[in-house]
UniProtKB/Swiss-Prot annotation:
It comes from the Eukaryota. Pfam families: p450 (PF00067). Heme binds at residue 518. Induction: Expression is down-regulated by the cluster-specific transcription factor AOL_s00215g275. Expression is also down-regulated by the HOG1-MAPK pathway downstream transcription factor MSN2. It comes from Arthrobotrys oligospora (strain ATCC 24927 / CBS 115.81 / DSM 1491). Belongs to the cytochrome P450 family. Disruption phenotype: Abolishes the production of arthrobotrisins A to D and arthrosporol A, and leads to the accumulation of farnesyl hydroquinone, the first hybrid precursor for biosynthesis of SECs. Shows substantial reduction in conidiation. Develops far more adhesive trapping devices and traps and increases the number of captured nematodes by the traps. Shows significantly increased ammonia levels in fungal mycelia. Cytochrome P450 monooxygenase; part of the gene cluster that mediates the biosynthesis of sesquiterpenyl epoxy-cyclohexenoids (SECs) such as anthrobotrisins and arthrosporols, metabolites that possess a novel hybrid carbon skeleton consisting of a polyketide-derived epoxycyclohexenol combined with a terpenoid-derived monocyclic sesquiterpenol substructure (PKS-PTS hybrid). The SEC pathway plays an important role for fungal soil colonization via decreasing fungal nematode-capturing ability. Keywords: Heme, Iron, Metal-binding, Monooxygenase, Oxidoreductase. This is Cytochrome P450 monooxygenase AOL_s00215g278. One of its GO terms (molecular function) is monooxygenase activity. Its cofactor is heme. Pathway: Secondary metabolite biosynthesis; terpenoid biosynthesis.
């Protein structure tokens, strides 16, 4: 090797090192200037929280950095930092603050008025669509991955799918699935133990199973018995629909964070996830075809798929209307990729978010015997004189479940499945909001995080914010049961100060806020209310005490485990909390 070649390699090495040092420093400088221009307080972090590389390695990197006493470098981008911080970060830095990193600028919002303003300005603060397309774009365009006119179309159609007839399907299948789950717990047939004490060893996976079965029937008309074993794999497939759906949804983070080439050349887990996604897509296309044929024969499946296929799709009609193109347009004149994309979103949201909300609600329920007594009174009143639980009519019973709905609302306040709601400015050049009577301009390509966990634990809006107190919701539930909108009662006054506070918009984000709130809110409520009825008609739930423990000891242990929840796609509980189902009388 010549001296010249040696010098060239040396220069190249120095250049690469300099580039990788200077680039992040320059990025930090640029984003610091942007933060200063907003006039908001700001802090630094060494890594951009939404960097794809960081998302892939942070769970491994964080313990190493912590062990090396370098955790302070990523204080505001470490795993689940905002869930751990709760409202403390806003107490220290203000209701709105910036996080400056080499890769971008993030603005965390914990002010209710600004939260409402941001959610109303959909075009100025759109969702980070690029990220959502990466997660679910494989299945087609959807309400989650669209904006502007396209989003309005998706929202209009998906709103029509969540109808009362569909909610009845959800109600009865939830009663069935929850009753079967309860019987399995009591019989000890949970593949873990043969004892008959009703100890529940796999609450999380059972909640996921229940939610998947319910949403599969409600979305696609496919009923899965609770005790169903491994399904037969159809010819030409590598997985059954249930197997593909379960694996895909359990490993959705791989779709979110991993490049597609890993599906073919990566580790076995990534390859299996790729196979699951491919098979799930093929199964869904087949189900769309079947439902389309049924509609042509005058049959209405009364499911979300059927409702979407009967929607008015101007774009498909512009391309030929109902002139049938088997590749892209259904016989009813609707784009198949649109139906596919939204069906996948229903499956993801109806499975993951409902299951996690139910899991947290059940654990909190078990920890609070006093709350159980209040709920039992309501359940007993509803069930008085009822012999068969399936005789209950959804439209008559659901509005009466005021206190039980309060349990769900309070559980999602303490443990929202999405601790922050992501917005962005992307390439928008005129994004601003009013904060403390001043206009605050947000630069393009910024991430705006509506900090649900921060505002949910703010004692200005929630007295005793760390306390599980469903009664704070009872007044709200009464108003909703009467059909009175919270917006109509903003000046609510009286002795119930909790209820008065609750009517301030932007203080509760468990189901989103504004025009882009969760369209499946009632779906989740119906599913979870029916589950509570089936589980607690004759039983209560208790914490399992370790030898020598009191209830208070077990409560503290369970609460600590809940507080160690971690964010993946949604908030997840990774630690086991033992509870048991026992007869009430």
């Amino acid at each position: 090797m010549t001296i010249i070649e040696n010098i060239s390699y040396t220069h190249l090495a120095i250049g690469l090192i300099a580039y990788n040092v200077i680039k992040p420093l320059y990025g930090l400088h640029v984003n610091r200037k942007k933060a200063i221009a907003t006039g908001l307080p700001y802090v630094y972090t060494a890594v951009y929280e939404w960097s794809m590389v960081w998302l892939l390695v942070k769970e491994i990197a964080w313990p190493v950095l912590k062990a090396l006493r370098l955790g302070w470098l990523v204080k505001y981008s470490r795993p689940s930092w905002n869930f751990d911080a709760k409202n403390k970060v806003h107490e220290d830095l203000g209701d709105i603050f910036c996080v400056v990193s080499p890769g971008g600028l993030s603005i965390f919002v914990g002010d209710p008025d600004v939260i409402c303003e941001v959610t109303k300005k959909r075009t100025k603060f759109p969702r980070p669509v690029k990220s959502f397309v990466k997660v679910m774009g494989y299945f087609g365009p959807s309400i989650l991955s669209s904006e502007h006119d396209e989003w309005r179309f998706h929202r209009r159609v998906t709103n029509k799918t969540f109808t009362e007839p569909n909610h009845k399907v959800v109600w009865f299948d939830s009663l069935y699935q929850a009753s079967a789950m309860r019987d399995e717990w009591l019989s000890g047939l949970d593949n873990i133990t043969s004892n008959k004490e009703g100890i529940i060893h796999k609450m999380g996976s059972d909640c996921m199973k229940l939610a998947l079965h319910v949403v599969t029937l409600a979305s696609f008309g496919v009923q899965i018995p609770w005790t169903a074993q491994k399904d037969a794999i159809p010819t030409g497939y590598e997985m059954s629909f249930r197997e593909a759906s379960e694996f895909f949804l359990e490993h959705i983070a791989i779709m979110a964070y991993c490049p597609k080439w890993l599906y073919k050349y990566g580790p076995k887990l990534a390859q299996t996830a790729g196979v699951a996604a491919k098979n799930m897509r093929r199964h869904m296309m087949e189900l769309i075809q079947i439902e389309d044929e049924k509609l042509q024969n005058g049959e209405d499946g009364k499911n979300l798929l059927s409702a979407m296929l009967q929607s008015d799709d101007p774009e498909a009609q512009a391309k030929g209307g109902s002139a049938y193109d088997t590749a892209s347009v259904s016989k009813t004149g609707v784009r198949k990729d649109f139906v596919m994309g939204n069906s996948a979103i229903f499956l993801l949201a109806g499975h993951e978010t409902s299951a996690r909300s139910l899991e947290y609600a059940l654990f909190l329920f078990a920890m609070h015997p006093d709350v159980q007594e209040e709920i039992f009174e309501e359940i007993d009143e509803i069930l008085e004189g009822v012999g068969n639980i399936y005789d209950l009519k959804y439209e008559e019973v659901f509005p009466k479940m005021v206190k039980t709905n309060g349990v769900l609302y309070e559980a999602t306040r303490l443990f929202p499945v999405t601790p922050y709601i992501p917005k962005s400015t992307e390439d928008v050049v005129d994004s601003w909001f009013i904060y403390k009577d001043q206009r605050v301009d947000i630069p393009p390509e910024s991430m705006v995080a509506l900090n649900a966990i921060g505002v949910h634990y703010n004692e200005r809006y929630w007295p005793e914010p760390y306390r599980f107190k469903p009664s704070r919701w009872y007044q709200t539930q009464k108003q909703e049961a009467l059909g009175i909108s919270p917006q109509d009662t903003l000046q609510l006054s009286g002795s119930n100060t909790d209820a008065a506070r609750l009517y301030r918009r932007g203080t509760y984000l468990g189901f989103g806020e504004g025009p882009r709130n969760c369209p499946g809110k009632r779906f989740a409520q119906v599913e979870i209310m029916a589950t509570f009825l089936a589980l607690f008609r004759e039983h209560r739930m208790e914490l399992v005490l370790e030898p020598g423990e009191t209830h208070r000891d077990a409560f503290d242990r369970a609460w600590a485990a809940l507080q160690r929840s971690r964010m993946v796609i949604t908030l997840n509980l990774f630690e086991q909390i033992k509870v048991k189902l026992v007869p009430r009388k």
